[in-house]
Amino acid sequence: MEYLTIALSSYLLGSIPFGFILTKIFLKKDIRNIGSGNIGATNALRTGNKTLGYATLFLDITKAVLPVLYVKFNYPDYIFIASLSAFLGHLFPIWLKFKGGKGVATYVGILLSINYILGLIFIISWIVTFLLSKYSSLSSLVASLIIPVYLIIFENFNSFFFIIMFVLIFYTHRENVKRLKNKEESKTKIY
């Protein structure tokens, strides 16, 4: 029963579409009709309201931190269930007919909660890649790949869970990958 309660509550928290909600409240627009149509932080930045974009980023990270930290300290055997459930909630939110974000900010929240070192590795990798390329999508893919590689090489750790997360992030970025390959991807302004 704990397993199901943790999975469901983590999914529901992860499925709160903050980019959609904030854009509706403050801009009176549907974020799904702006930029890429995605509900996440990068597209929230494309609304032209940087504060809204950063608020979306913070809230999308937080909605993973809350259930994962709670489970980490109270039901540690279920930490990966809580993590995956929150992540899937963001990707496939019940509130938006299962059409959600790409999962990067939520993944950062998961990493920071499981082991803040992993979160910092992700963030630093993302920033370095972004400074070199100006592509948010490429930065997300590189940083997501670095986590399981780091764990395999330096921690001798079973990184199956993190490989699954990378595959899901790659899947959500499949259109970005095509645009990157064809040199049609838009660069992102984050400041």
Residue spans for each PLM region:
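Interfacial segments of multi-pass membrane proteins
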Residues: 45-48, 67, 71-75, 89, ...
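Hydrophobic alpha-helical transmembrane segments
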Residues: 4-9, 53-54, 79-84, 120-124, ...
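N-terminal signal-anchor transmembrane alpha helix
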Residues: 2-26
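Multi-pass membrane proteins that catalyze or facilitate reactions on polyprenyl-/lipid-phosphate substrates
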Residues: 2, 6, 15, 136-191
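Short, non-helical or kinked segments that cap or interrupt transmembrane helices
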Residues: 30-38, 96-106, 135-143
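Nucleotide and nucleotide-moiety/phosphate-recognizing core
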Residues: 6, 52-54, 62-93, 126-127
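Transmembrane alpha-helix interface/packing and boundary motifs in multi-pass membrane proteins
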Residues: 11-15, 24, 87-97, 130-134
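Cytosolic, membrane-interface loops and tails of multi-pass inner-membrane proteins
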Residues: 20-53, 176-191
